C-alpha cells in the first residue's frame, strides 16, 4: 500500500423493508472530504457495499474489524499522532470511527479537527 485507505459504505443501501439507508459516520467523512478535497489526493477512498462480509476490509484487518468507516494506515502511523487509538492487525494499523479518523486526518494532513 502506498496511501492510507479510507473505507466508507455506499449510500442508499437496503436493510429490510422501507426506505434506503446511509451510514451517518460515513456521511460525516464524506463531508470532510468535500470540505478538504485535497484529502482525496493523499487517501485511497474506497466505497464498499453494506452487506457483510466486506471482503476487501476483511482481507486486510480481519472479520472483527470490518465496520465502516475505517482508515487503514499504509506505512504505520507517524510518531507525532496523539490521542488516537491505532490497533494493529496483520501488521497493519487502522483507525475506526468518524471522530477518530477526523482527529487522525487533522494531525497527519493539517485539516480541521472534529469539534
Predicted regions: what they are:
Residues 1-115:
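GST-like domain detector, emphasizing the conserved glutathione-binding G-site
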Amino acid at each position: 500500500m502506498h496511501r492510507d485507505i479510507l473505507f466508507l459504505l455506499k449510500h442508499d443501501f437496503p436493510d429490510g423493508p422501507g426506505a434506503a439507508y446511509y451510514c451517518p459516520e460515513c456521511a460525516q467523512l464524506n463531508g470532510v472530504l468535500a470540505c478538504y478535497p485535497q484529502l482525496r489526493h493523499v487517501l485511497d477512498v474506497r466505497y464498499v457495499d453494506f452487506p457483510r462480509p466486506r471482503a476487501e476490509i476483511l482481507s486486510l484487518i480481519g472479520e472483527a474489524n470490518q465496520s465502516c468507516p475505517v482508515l487503514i494506515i499504509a506505512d504505520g502511523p507517524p510518531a507525532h499522532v496523539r490521542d488516537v487509538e491505532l490497533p494493529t492487525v496483520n501488521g497493519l494499523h487502522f483507525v475506526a470511527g468518524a471522530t477518530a479518523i477526523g482527529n487522525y486526518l487533522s494531525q497527519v494532513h493539517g485539516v480541521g479537527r472534529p469539534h
